[in-house]
Design a protein with these regions (language model features):
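A short secondary-structure junction motif
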Residues: 39, 43-46, 84, 128-131, ...
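Alpha-helix N-cap/loop-to-helix boundary motif
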Residues: 21, 28, 54, 58, ...
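Alpha-helical initiation/capping and key positions within long helical/coiled-coil segments
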Residues: 24, 28-31, 61, 65, ...
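Acidic/histidine-rich alpha-helical segments that form the ligand environment
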Residues: 28-39, 76, 97-134
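Solvent-exposed interaction patches of small proteins and small membrane subunits
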Residues: 20-27, 83-86, 104-105, 109-112, ...
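Short, contiguous, helix-prone interaction/anchoring segments in small proteins
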Residues: 21-55
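Short, contiguous alpha-helical
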Residues: 1-15, 49-93, 122, 134-171
Length: 171
């Protein structure tokens, strides 16, 4: 698999795609699942309620956001890989957090949800043909390819893991 080219995704997503130097994106997504599981083992239920500042997400909300992102990006990838050309609306992440119940869900359930969602996404990506990987569609009023969405998913996790390490777990 080659890296997505500029024009296959909105410029905004370059901040995620640039975090993924590898080209075997399915392996990256698979390795992240093990990395996430390892990190989650170090966080207690008590610690999962921590937010590093006022109006900042708790660890639980961060994990919930990652699950929401996995679902949104994979939904886009599924539709586009099936040659669905219907434009896909964007979503407002803060609104999703505000209307969630993440802080009242057990940390173990939140982490299991993310890991199972990632596993399902891996199965989807492994099933795609070369042609499907290159299909493009429209999401959030911008063009996006299936392969770009996979790289965005991996970069999105890397972006938030960096924040988790630096702002939540380093204190």
């Amino acid at each position: 698999m080659t890296r997505p080219e500029k024009g296959e995704y909105a410029e905004y997503y370059d901040r995620y795609i640039s975090l993924v130097e590898e080209t075997d994106i399915v392996s990256v997504l698979d390795q992240q699942q093990a990395e996430l599981d390892e990190i989650f083992q170090t966080i207690t239920e008590e610690k999962s309620h921590y937010a590093y500042g006022p109006d900042k997400w708790t660890i639980k909300e961060l994990i919930g956001h990652l699950s929401d992102g996995e679902r949104m990006f994979s939904y886009r990838a599924l539709r586009i890989s099936r040659a669905d050309q219907t434009p896909i609306e964007g979503f407002e992440q803060d609104g999703y957090i505000e209307n969630s119940n993440f802080n009242n869900v057990s940390f173990s359930d939140l982490t299991a949800e993310l890991l199972y969602t990632r596993k399902a996404n891996l199965i989807l990506f492994k099933s795609l043909t070369d042609e499907a990987w290159l299909r493009t569609g429209t999401a959030s009023e911008n063009p996006v390819s299936v392969r770009a969405l996979a790289f965005i998913m991996a970069g999105h996790i890397r972006h938030h893991l960096k924040i988790l390490y630096e702002r939540y777990l380093a204190q």
